[in-house]
From Swiss-Prot:
Record InterPro entries: UreF (IPR002639), UreF_sf (IPR038277)
Molecular function, one GO term: nickel cation binding
Observed phenotype of the null mutant: Fails to grow on agar media with urea as the sole nitrogen source. Leads to the inactivation of the URE1 urease and reduces the efficacy of brain invasion in mice.
Subunit record text: URE4, URE6 and URE7 may form a complex that acts as a GTP-hydrolysis-dependent molecular chaperone, activating the urease apoprotein URE1.
Lineage: Eukaryota, Fungi, Dikarya, Basidiomycota, Agaricomycotina
Name of the protein: Urease accessory protein 6
Amino acid sequence: MASLNPSAKELHLLYVLTDSNLPTGGFVSSSGLESFAKHGFLSSQYSYTPKEFKDGVLGKKNMTGGLVDFARAEVSNYASTTGGFVMDGWTCVNDSRKASKAGNGIIEDEVQRVLQKIQALDKYHECTLLSHVGRRSSKAQGVAMLTLFSRGLSRPVGIDEYLNEDGGGPGSTDELGVKIVEGYKKMVILEKAPGHLAVCWGVITAALGLPVDRALHLHLFLHARSLLSSAVRLNIIGPYASSQLLLHPYRDIINQEVEKLSNCTTGIIEDKAEKCGEEEDLWAWTEDAEKGPATTWPLGEVLMGRHDIQHSRIFNS
Protein backbone atom coordinates (compact mmCIF):
# COMPACT_ATOMS: atom_id res chain seq x y z
CA MET A 1 0.00 0.00 0.00
CA ALA A 2 1.35 3.40 -0.93
CA SER A 3 2.16 5.97 1.70
CA LEU A 4 -0.05 9.05 2.02
CA ASN A 5 3.17 11.05 1.79
CA PRO A 6 5.16 9.56 -1.11
CA SER A 7 8.92 9.89 -1.03
CA ALA A 8 10.86 12.02 -3.47
CA LYS A 9 11.98 8.86 -5.29
CA GLU A 10 8.42 7.66 -5.71
CA LEU A 11 7.25 11.03 -6.99
CA HIS A 12 10.14 11.17 -9.44
CA LEU A 13 9.29 7.70 -10.75
CA LEU A 14 5.65 8.73 -11.20
CA TYR A 15 6.74 11.81 -13.16
CA VAL A 16 8.92 9.67 -15.41
CA LEU A 17 6.16 7.12 -16.07
CA THR A 18 3.60 9.82 -16.89
CA ASP A 19 5.89 11.46 -19.44
CA SER A 20 3.93 11.58 -22.69
CA ASN A 21 7.20 11.22 -24.64
CA LEU A 22 7.80 7.69 -23.36
CA PRO A 23 7.59 5.19 -26.26
CA THR A 24 4.87 3.01 -24.73
CA GLY A 25 3.11 2.16 -28.00
CA GLY A 26 -0.17 3.72 -26.84
CA PHE A 27 -0.37 6.03 -29.88
CA VAL A 28 -1.30 3.06 -32.11
CA SER A 29 -4.50 2.33 -30.18
CA SER A 30 -7.75 4.25 -29.78
CA SER A 31 -9.28 1.53 -27.55
CA GLY A 32 -12.34 1.32 -29.77
CA LEU A 33 -12.96 5.08 -29.98
CA GLU A 34 -12.31 5.27 -33.73
CA SER A 35 -14.76 2.46 -34.49
CA PHE A 36 -17.25 3.89 -31.99
CA ALA A 37 -17.19 7.26 -33.75
CA LYS A 38 -17.20 5.81 -37.28
CA HIS A 39 -20.30 3.75 -36.47
CA GLY A 40 -22.13 6.96 -35.56
CA PHE A 41 -22.48 6.50 -31.81
CA LEU A 42 -20.35 9.46 -30.80
CA SER A 43 -21.84 11.97 -33.26
CA SER A 44 -25.45 10.89 -32.78
CA GLN A 45 -27.83 13.84 -32.38
CA TYR A 46 -29.27 12.44 -29.16
CA SER A 47 -27.71 10.95 -26.08
CA TYR A 48 -27.60 7.18 -25.73
CA THR A 49 -27.47 7.08 -21.91
CA PRO A 50 -30.62 6.85 -19.72
CA LYS A 51 -29.20 9.54 -17.42
CA GLU A 52 -29.89 12.17 -20.10
CA PHE A 53 -33.70 11.78 -19.97
CA LYS A 54 -35.56 15.05 -19.37
CA ASP A 55 -39.35 14.92 -19.19
CA GLY A 56 -39.27 11.57 -20.94
CA VAL A 57 -37.28 12.92 -23.89
CA LEU A 58 -33.62 12.27 -24.61
CA GLY A 59 -31.64 15.48 -24.43
CA LYS A 60 -29.19 16.60 -27.06
CA LYS A 61 -25.53 16.03 -26.32
CA ASN A 62 -22.38 17.70 -27.54
CA MET A 63 -19.17 15.95 -28.55
CA THR A 64 -17.41 16.46 -25.22
CA GLY A 65 -20.38 14.99 -23.39
CA GLY A 66 -20.24 12.01 -25.71
CA LEU A 67 -16.57 11.50 -24.89
CA VAL A 68 -17.34 11.55 -21.17
CA ASP A 69 -20.07 8.93 -21.64
CA PHE A 70 -17.73 6.84 -23.76
CA ALA A 71 -14.93 7.07 -21.19
CA ARG A 72 -17.24 6.17 -18.32
CA ALA A 73 -18.24 2.93 -20.05
CA GLU A 74 -14.88 2.12 -21.64
CA VAL A 75 -12.64 2.82 -18.63
CA SER A 76 -14.95 0.77 -16.42
CA ASN A 77 -14.75 -2.13 -18.86
CA TYR A 78 -10.98 -1.76 -19.17
CA ALA A 79 -10.52 -1.72 -15.40
CA SER A 80 -12.70 -4.80 -14.97
CA THR A 81 -10.92 -6.79 -17.68
CA THR A 82 -7.30 -5.81 -16.91
CA GLY A 83 -7.11 -4.71 -13.25
CA GLY A 84 -6.76 -8.23 -11.87
CA PHE A 85 -3.87 -8.98 -14.23
CA VAL A 86 -2.01 -5.85 -13.16
CA MET A 87 -2.54 -6.78 -9.51
CA ASP A 88 -1.45 -10.41 -9.90
CA GLY A 89 1.53 -9.58 -12.10
CA TRP A 90 2.66 -7.03 -9.52
CA THR A 91 2.10 -9.48 -6.65
CA CYS A 92 4.17 -12.23 -8.30
CA VAL A 93 7.23 -10.02 -8.65
CA ASN A 94 6.84 -8.17 -5.35
CA ASP A 95 6.50 -11.38 -3.31
CA SER A 96 9.57 -12.75 -5.04
CA ARG A 97 11.58 -9.62 -4.27
CA LYS A 98 10.62 -9.84 -0.61
CA ALA A 99 11.65 -13.51 -0.45
CA SER A 100 14.95 -12.70 -2.14
CA LYS A 101 15.76 -9.91 0.31
CA ALA A 102 15.01 -12.29 3.17
CA GLY A 103 17.59 -14.71 1.76
CA ASN A 104 15.11 -17.42 0.81
CA GLY A 105 16.15 -19.52 -2.19
CA ILE A 106 18.52 -19.10 -5.11
CA ILE A 107 17.88 -16.25 -7.51
CA GLU A 108 17.83 -18.39 -10.67
CA ASP A 109 15.34 -20.83 -9.15
CA GLU A 110 13.18 -17.97 -7.91
CA VAL A 111 13.20 -16.31 -11.33
CA GLN A 112 12.01 -19.50 -13.05
CA ARG A 113 9.27 -20.00 -10.47
CA VAL A 114 7.97 -16.47 -10.96
CA LEU A 115 8.21 -16.70 -14.75
CA GLN A 116 6.01 -19.80 -14.72
CA LYS A 117 3.34 -17.87 -12.82
CA ILE A 118 3.62 -14.89 -15.14
CA GLN A 119 3.37 -17.16 -18.18
CA ALA A 120 0.17 -18.76 -16.86
CA LEU A 121 -1.25 -15.33 -16.04
CA ASP A 122 -0.42 -14.00 -19.49
CA LYS A 123 -1.97 -16.96 -21.30
CA TYR A 124 -5.11 -16.59 -19.19
CA HIS A 125 -5.30 -12.93 -20.20
CA GLU A 126 -5.10 -14.00 -23.85
CA CYS A 127 -8.20 -16.15 -23.29
CA THR A 128 -10.19 -13.40 -21.58
CA LEU A 129 -9.80 -10.81 -24.35
CA LEU A 130 -12.83 -11.18 -26.60
CA SER A 131 -11.62 -9.83 -29.95
CA HIS A 132 -8.51 -10.18 -32.09
CA VAL A 133 -8.32 -6.38 -32.23
CA GLY A 134 -8.06 -6.08 -28.46
CA ARG A 135 -5.46 -8.84 -28.28
CA ARG A 136 -3.37 -7.26 -31.01
CA SER A 137 -3.38 -3.85 -29.35
CA SER A 138 -2.62 -5.24 -25.90
CA LYS A 139 0.33 -7.28 -27.16
CA ALA A 140 1.78 -4.39 -29.15
CA GLN A 141 1.73 -2.13 -26.10
CA GLY A 142 3.01 -4.89 -23.82
CA VAL A 143 6.06 -5.49 -26.01
CA ALA A 144 6.66 -1.73 -26.11
CA MET A 145 6.62 -1.60 -22.29
CA LEU A 146 9.12 -4.46 -21.98
CA THR A 147 11.39 -2.76 -24.50
CA LEU A 148 11.03 0.52 -22.62
CA PHE A 149 12.13 -1.12 -19.38
CA SER A 150 15.25 -2.59 -20.98
CA ARG A 151 16.27 0.49 -22.94
CA GLY A 152 14.77 3.40 -21.07
CA LEU A 153 14.24 2.54 -17.40
CA SER A 154 17.23 0.36 -16.54
CA ARG A 155 20.33 1.82 -14.89
CA PRO A 156 22.65 3.47 -17.44
CA VAL A 157 26.06 1.89 -17.93
CA GLY A 158 29.31 3.65 -17.12
CA ILE A 159 28.05 6.45 -14.86
CA ASP A 160 27.94 4.70 -11.47
CA GLU A 161 30.11 7.44 -9.96
CA TYR A 162 27.35 9.96 -10.68
CA LEU A 163 24.57 7.89 -9.14
CA ASN A 164 23.59 8.22 -5.51
CA GLU A 165 21.31 5.20 -5.02
CA ASP A 166 21.15 2.85 -2.08
CA GLY A 167 19.62 0.02 -4.13
CA GLY A 168 16.16 0.37 -2.65
CA GLY A 169 12.97 2.34 -2.95
CA PRO A 170 10.84 3.32 -5.92
CA GLY A 171 12.78 3.65 -9.15
CA SER A 172 15.59 1.29 -8.18
CA THR A 173 15.81 -2.13 -9.77
CA ASP A 174 17.45 -5.03 -7.96
CA GLU A 175 19.05 -8.01 -9.71
CA LEU A 176 16.02 -10.23 -9.25
CA GLY A 177 13.58 -7.69 -10.69
CA VAL A 178 15.74 -7.15 -13.77
CA LYS A 179 16.16 -10.90 -14.33
CA ILE A 180 12.40 -11.45 -14.10
CA VAL A 181 11.61 -8.72 -16.62
CA GLU A 182 14.35 -9.86 -19.00
CA GLY A 183 13.23 -13.49 -18.66
CA TYR A 184 9.65 -12.49 -19.39
CA LYS A 185 10.76 -10.48 -22.42
CA LYS A 186 12.66 -13.51 -23.71
CA MET A 187 9.53 -15.68 -23.35
CA VAL A 188 7.56 -13.15 -25.38
CA ILE A 189 10.22 -13.08 -28.11
CA LEU A 190 10.19 -16.90 -28.25
CA GLU A 191 6.35 -16.77 -28.38
CA LYS A 192 6.04 -18.73 -25.14
CA ALA A 193 3.93 -15.91 -23.69
CA PRO A 194 1.71 -13.33 -25.43
CA GLY A 195 3.09 -10.30 -23.57
CA HIS A 196 -0.14 -8.46 -22.81
CA LEU A 197 0.04 -4.89 -21.52
CA ALA A 198 -1.70 -5.41 -18.16
CA VAL A 199 0.65 -8.23 -17.13
CA CYS A 200 3.71 -6.35 -18.40
CA TRP A 201 2.67 -3.24 -16.50
CA GLY A 202 2.21 -5.13 -13.24
CA VAL A 203 5.58 -6.88 -13.62
CA ILE A 204 7.49 -3.72 -14.53
CA THR A 205 6.01 -1.47 -11.83
CA ALA A 206 6.78 -4.12 -9.20
CA ALA A 207 10.35 -4.42 -10.48
CA LEU A 208 10.67 -0.63 -10.18
CA GLY A 209 9.29 -0.69 -6.62
CA LEU A 210 6.10 1.28 -7.29
CA PRO A 211 3.30 0.51 -4.76
CA VAL A 212 0.44 -1.50 -6.22
CA ASP A 213 -2.30 1.08 -5.69
CA ARG A 214 -0.22 3.70 -7.47
CA ALA A 215 0.46 1.19 -10.26
CA LEU A 216 -3.27 0.55 -10.70
CA HIS A 217 -4.14 4.24 -10.60
CA LEU A 218 -1.43 5.08 -13.13
CA HIS A 219 -2.56 2.19 -15.34
CA LEU A 220 -6.05 3.68 -15.64
CA PHE A 221 -4.82 7.27 -15.84
CA LEU A 222 -2.57 6.51 -18.80
CA HIS A 223 -5.38 4.61 -20.50
CA ALA A 224 -7.83 7.48 -20.04
CA ARG A 225 -5.26 9.97 -21.28
CA SER A 226 -4.65 7.85 -24.38
CA LEU A 227 -8.40 7.97 -25.14
CA LEU A 228 -8.23 11.76 -25.20
CA SER A 229 -5.06 11.72 -27.30
CA SER A 230 -6.90 9.52 -29.78
CA ALA A 231 -9.84 11.93 -29.79
CA VAL A 232 -7.49 14.80 -30.65
CA ARG A 233 -5.85 12.83 -33.48
CA LEU A 234 -9.29 11.93 -34.80
CA ASN A 235 -10.17 15.65 -34.79
CA ILE A 236 -13.11 15.05 -32.46
CA ILE A 237 -11.90 17.64 -29.94
CA GLY A 238 -8.95 19.99 -29.63
CA PRO A 239 -6.00 19.83 -27.21
CA TYR A 240 -7.49 22.40 -24.82
CA ALA A 241 -10.76 20.47 -24.51
CA SER A 242 -8.70 17.32 -23.98
CA SER A 243 -6.92 18.89 -21.00
CA GLN A 244 -10.22 20.10 -19.56
CA LEU A 245 -11.78 16.65 -19.76
CA LEU A 246 -8.74 14.93 -18.25
CA LEU A 247 -8.59 17.37 -15.32
CA HIS A 248 -12.28 17.40 -14.45
CA PRO A 249 -14.74 14.62 -15.46
CA TYR A 250 -12.08 12.00 -16.21
CA ARG A 251 -10.60 12.44 -12.73
CA ASP A 252 -13.82 11.21 -11.13
CA ILE A 253 -14.15 8.37 -13.63
CA ILE A 254 -10.63 7.15 -12.88
CA ASN A 255 -10.99 7.47 -9.10
CA GLN A 256 -14.25 5.51 -9.08
CA GLU A 257 -12.69 2.62 -10.96
CA VAL A 258 -9.51 2.62 -8.85
CA GLU A 259 -11.60 2.19 -5.70
CA LYS A 260 -13.26 -0.88 -7.21
CA LEU A 261 -9.85 -2.47 -7.87
CA SER A 262 -8.62 -2.46 -4.27
CA ASN A 263 -9.06 -6.24 -3.93
CA CYS A 264 -9.09 -7.29 -7.59
CA THR A 265 -7.48 -10.56 -8.69
CA THR A 266 -7.71 -13.11 -11.45
CA GLY A 267 -7.83 -15.94 -8.92
CA ILE A 268 -5.41 -18.20 -10.80
CA ILE A 269 -2.19 -17.61 -8.86
CA GLU A 270 -3.59 -18.00 -5.35
CA ASP A 271 -1.92 -20.56 -3.15
CA LYS A 272 -4.22 -23.58 -3.16
CA ALA A 273 -2.27 -25.48 -0.51
CA GLU A 274 -4.48 -24.27 2.32
CA LYS A 275 -7.52 -25.68 0.53
CA CYS A 276 -6.14 -29.21 0.56
CA GLY A 277 -8.10 -31.45 2.88
CA GLU A 278 -11.21 -29.30 2.69
CA GLU A 279 -14.36 -30.79 1.26
CA GLU A 280 -14.80 -29.68 -2.33
CA ASP A 281 -17.68 -27.27 -2.77
CA LEU A 282 -19.86 -27.96 -5.79
CA TRP A 283 -20.25 -24.24 -6.42
CA ALA A 284 -16.69 -23.17 -5.64
CA TRP A 285 -16.11 -22.33 -9.29
CA THR A 286 -18.67 -19.51 -9.05
CA GLU A 287 -16.59 -17.77 -6.39
CA ASP A 288 -13.52 -17.94 -8.63
CA ALA A 289 -15.56 -16.61 -11.56
CA GLU A 290 -16.75 -13.62 -9.51
CA LYS A 291 -13.17 -12.73 -8.61
CA GLY A 292 -11.92 -12.88 -12.17
CA PRO A 293 -12.05 -10.42 -15.07
CA ALA A 294 -15.42 -9.55 -16.57
CA THR A 295 -16.67 -7.57 -19.54
CA THR A 296 -19.00 -4.78 -18.43
CA TRP A 297 -19.61 -3.12 -21.81
CA PRO A 298 -20.47 -5.63 -24.58
CA LEU A 299 -21.26 -2.88 -27.10
CA GLY A 300 -17.73 -1.54 -26.83
CA GLU A 301 -16.28 -5.02 -27.36
CA VAL A 302 -18.44 -5.57 -30.45
CA LEU A 303 -17.49 -2.23 -31.99
CA MET A 304 -13.80 -2.79 -31.28
CA GLY A 305 -14.07 -6.17 -33.02
CA ARG A 306 -15.42 -4.35 -36.09
CA HIS A 307 -12.43 -2.00 -36.25
CA ASP A 308 -10.74 -3.77 -39.16
CA ILE A 309 -13.75 -3.53 -41.49
CA GLN A 310 -13.57 0.27 -41.66
CA HIS A 311 -12.66 1.57 -45.12
CA SER A 312 -10.07 3.93 -43.65
CA ARG A 313 -8.55 4.00 -40.19
CA ILE A 314 -5.76 5.71 -38.28
CA PHE A 315 -5.29 3.32 -35.36
CA ASN A 316 -4.82 -0.44 -35.11
CA SER A 317 -7.63 -0.78 -32.55
